[in-house]
């Protein structure tokens, strides 16, 4: 049994403030794309969970979000059976595409079917929130505004490219650790994010500009300011 794990991009991302708990409040427009990894699963009659990869990994399997997602679901719903998991990894690490989070979300969807739990999306999203800020969105994917640390989601009508519009995602061979990206990023406050949301919502209603037009014409990412000087290849 297989499950595709579509990655995501941020068509808009603004770092609003740093919180007292050390995390950052964001305003972002999430969009899944048609590229991603694939998670496969084979049912085990015992309760063991195994994980293998198509390429060598530099970290213990127990720290992988795929393994953590399987263990979390097994524990939360007292599943008596196990699973052999296989991750076909094609998305690059440290690229900001949410590859690991997408893999975790795909694992939850996959095991929901394999273990015949029949859980609604809402239950999967509750589990996903315990795995990482991006994971709840990637349970369903599509298009959504996200706030807080990324966990406060407002789904919107799915964005569709027009026939004459194309989106190319380029990932240079220069991984950027999350800690480095946040180190020098400016905190803008809420004004830019609120103005973006207002402009997006008015697109297609009070203006001839459609939502996808507005999104593509207003691509923005706060991390460019902190990342480009240290990672010129990304720029």
Describe each PLM feature range.
Residues 1-95, 113, 117-122, 159-161, ...:
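ATP-binding N-lobe of GHMP and related small-molecule kinases
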Residues 4, 19, 55, 59, ...:
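Alpha-helix initiation/capping motif
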Residues 140, 145-235:
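Conserved, helical-rich catalytic subdomain that frames metal- and/or nucleotide-binding sites
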Residues 78-151:
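Gly/Ser-rich oxyanion-binding loop with an adjacent helix/lid
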Residues 27, 64, 102, 225-228, ...:
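A generic "alpha-helical surface" signal
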């Amino acid at each position: 049994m297989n499950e595709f794990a579509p990655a995501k991009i941020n068509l808009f991302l603004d770092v609003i403030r740093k919180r007292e708990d050390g995390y950052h409040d964001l305003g972002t427009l999430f969009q899944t794309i048609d590229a991603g990894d694939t998670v496969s699963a084979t049912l085990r009659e015992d309760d063991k969970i195994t994980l293998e990869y198509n390429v060598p990994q530099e970290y213990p399997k127990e720290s992988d979000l795929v393994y953590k997602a399987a263990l979390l679901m097994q524990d939360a719903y007292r599943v008596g059976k196990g699973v052999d998991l296989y991750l076909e990894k094609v998305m690059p690490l440290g690229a900001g595409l949410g590859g690991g989070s997408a893999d975790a979300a795909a694992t939850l969807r996959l095991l929901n079917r394999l273990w015949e739990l029949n859980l609604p999306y809402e239950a999967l999203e509750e589990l996903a929130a315990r795995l990482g800020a991006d994971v709840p969105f990637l349970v369903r994917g599509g298009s959504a505004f996200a706030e807080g640390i990324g966990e406060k989601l407002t789904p919107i009508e799915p964005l569709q490219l027009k026939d004459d519009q194309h989106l190319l995602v380029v990932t240079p061979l220069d991984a950027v650790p999350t800690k480095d990206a946040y180190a020098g990023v400016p905190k803008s406050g809420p004004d830019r994010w609120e103005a973006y949301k207002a402009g997006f919502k008015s697109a297609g209603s009070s203006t001839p500009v459609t939502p996808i037009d507005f999104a593509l014409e207003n691509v923005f990412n706060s991390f460019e300011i902190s990342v480009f000087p240290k990672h010129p290849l990304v720029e």
